[in-house]
């Protein structure tokens, strides 16, 4: 075999551009009431609803972001399959070839038509009277002897962040997300095959060495944190009626929660009001906005 050569300059520059690649995506940023976006920042939502569409920043795309997202999707599929094989994961299972859905039931199922192993279908959290958001649950485990129900959420991250979790505990936003799922089930608002969740578990998995480096974190379900989650949504919606920017969840642009914020450069500007429209963009459907304070009150009384 011949000796290796130094890369041609053209190739070296091309590879470097790919590794560092970053550009505006096709879509402008928006704020959705999804569990994966919790906790909702009231100030970000207010800016989103009053910033003219043409001035809203585009969602940034990057090679590293694409690589992380795609590897995360693949790891989720592998984790769900092997939790089904080894731990009788509870949920719905689908054969895409035959378009057959089975469950909710425990363990990887064979397709009744072609006998091929079926793929785990994440249980959906739907909006309801006390649940003003949507989302998908990564995994449910039911302990056979005690019927204890665990809600699992997989987070694929870098080795450095695994170290941070082991030192300082889970990321706040991740707990808000999985806790919201658990409360949605415990409030009796979801048809997912289980009627309660006893514990939530965040499983941080190293994208580079998923078979070696895990950092599982078990936590209780908190009604108090859920009420805070709903209060943030209610504050965001109410601010649009009052047309006054509310406080956000960050204290400065240096706050860790602000790192990926699409509007952090204008959020703390003393000239913020001059950048916003005097009209809601796009307009709300009025009746829908009035529900959030009532939802919070009903959860408090539940």
Name each model feature, range by range.
Residues 72-76, 176-179, 255, 259:
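Non-catalytic, well-ordered alpha-helical scaffold segments
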Residues 105, 184-302:
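Metal-dependent nuclease catalytic regions and adjoining charged, substrate-binding loops involved
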Residues 61, 65, 69, 167-172, ...:
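Short, charged/polar micro-motifs that form catalytic or ligand-binding hotspots
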């Amino acid at each position: 075999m011949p000796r290796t050569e130094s890369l041609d300059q053209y190739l070296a520059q091309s590879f470097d551009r790919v590794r560092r690649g970053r550009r505006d995506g096709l879509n402008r940023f928006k704020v959705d009431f999804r569990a994966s976006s919790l906790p909702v920042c009231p100030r970000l939502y207010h800016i989103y609803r009053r910033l003219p569409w043409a001035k809203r920043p585009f969602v940034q795309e990057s090679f590293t972001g694409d690589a992380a997202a795609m590897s995360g999707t693949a790891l989720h599929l592998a984790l769900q399959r092997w939790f089904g094989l080894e731990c009788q994961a509870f949920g719905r299972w689908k054969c895409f070839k035959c378009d057959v859905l089975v469950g909710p039931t425990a363990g990887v199922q064979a397709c009744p038509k072609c006998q091929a192993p079926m793929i785990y279908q994440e249980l959906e959290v739907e909006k309801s009277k006390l649940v003003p958001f949507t989302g998908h649950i990564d995994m449910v485990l039911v302990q056979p002897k005690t019927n204890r129900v665990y809600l699992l959420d997989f987070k694929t991250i870098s080795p450095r962040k695994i170290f941070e979790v082991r030192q300082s505990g889970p990321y706040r936003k991740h707990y808000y997300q999985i806790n919201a799922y658990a409360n949605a089930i415990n409030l009796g608002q979801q048809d997912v095959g289980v009627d309660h969740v006893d514990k939530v578990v965040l499983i941080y998995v190293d994208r580079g060495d998923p078979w070696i480096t895990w950092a599982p974190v078990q936590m209780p379900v908190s009604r108090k944190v859920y009420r805070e989650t709903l209060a943030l949504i209610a504050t965001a919606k109410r601010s649009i009626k009052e047309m006054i920017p509310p406080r956000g969840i960050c204290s400065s642009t240096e706050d860790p929660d602000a790192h990926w914020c699409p509007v952090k450069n204008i959020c703390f500007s003393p000239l913020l009001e001059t950048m916003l429209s005097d009209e809601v963009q796009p307009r709300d459907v009025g009746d829908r906005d009035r529900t959030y304070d009532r939802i919070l009150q009903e959860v408090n009384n539940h």
